[in-house]
């Protein structure tokens, strides 16, 4: 069975056909509409899937935000603008006339990365550190989504009660400090206004402030991982995302994790599927799992 997989992100929409063998073909991308209106998103999705839908038997969506009953929600509803409660599943079923499932993109990526692990692993956690910080939890060989779709939103756990206000509305979340957006927001002086990519580049040039910002992010992530180990007793943690996979970052996280008591240590692995993880994970879930 061929699945039409769709990945809905803050800046881009992606779609591809994925066979039962997990091979990705005919991958396409469009920019996410700047206008946060249901009409604009529906039109963009229609343009994205129309060349592909005739070759698929089902649709699987991986999307930013919380997916509940097939609709799009967010920790902070204001972040979605007019897309709050957008009916993802219903819309794609109408556009394609195919059975459709939808899941959070980090949860989908977690499932893809879990399927790619070697050895007898039943419990793992995936963390993506990019513009934000998200995640997914696999326990006993099953992906946890939760009755309300919130499971795995680990970027919104507490890192610093006196830290910056997060986009979700809480104060001091991991995401507000460790994410690419959090790194950039803390930059001052010469680095003010620089994004995380530029700050990483300055690390390689020996910039002291840039090094401090990246170390701060890695230290917060290591503490999060120790908390995750204590909560889930997972066998490994897979780290992805543009920040998580940046040169030298995972090694820094490992250094800070090693400073935690031994009971909270866990194997850290770099994500394998990178930007295709959401597409692949959603397709794998549609092909073999009931959400």
Swiss-Prot record:
Keywords: ATP-binding, Carbohydrate metabolism, Kinase, Metal-binding, Nucleotide-binding, Transferase, Zinc. Pathway: Amino-sugar metabolism; N-acetylneuraminate degradation; D-fructose 6-phosphate from N-acetylneuraminate: step 2/5. This is N-acetylmannosamine kinase. PANTHER family: N-ACETYLMANNOSAMINE KINASE, ROK (REPRESSOR, ORF, KINASE) FAMILY. ATP binds at residues 5-12, 132-139. Zn(2+) binds at residues 156, 166, 168, 173. Transmembrane segments: none annotated. It catalyses: an N-acyl-D-mannosamine + ATP = an N-acyl-D-mannosamine 6-phosphate + ADP + H(+). Gene3D superfamilies: 3.30.420.40. Catalyzes the phosphorylation of N-acetylmannosamine (ManNAc) to ManNAc-6-P. One of its GO terms (molecular function) is ATP binding. It comes from the Bacteria. Belongs to the ROK (NagC/XylR) family. NanK subfamily. It comes from Escherichia fergusonii (strain ATCC 35469 / DSM 13698 / CCUG 18766 / IAM 14443 / JCM 21226 / LMG 7866 / NBRC 102419 / NCTC 12128 / CDC 0568-73). InterPro entries: ATPase_NBD, ManNAc_kinase_bac, ROK, ROK_cs.
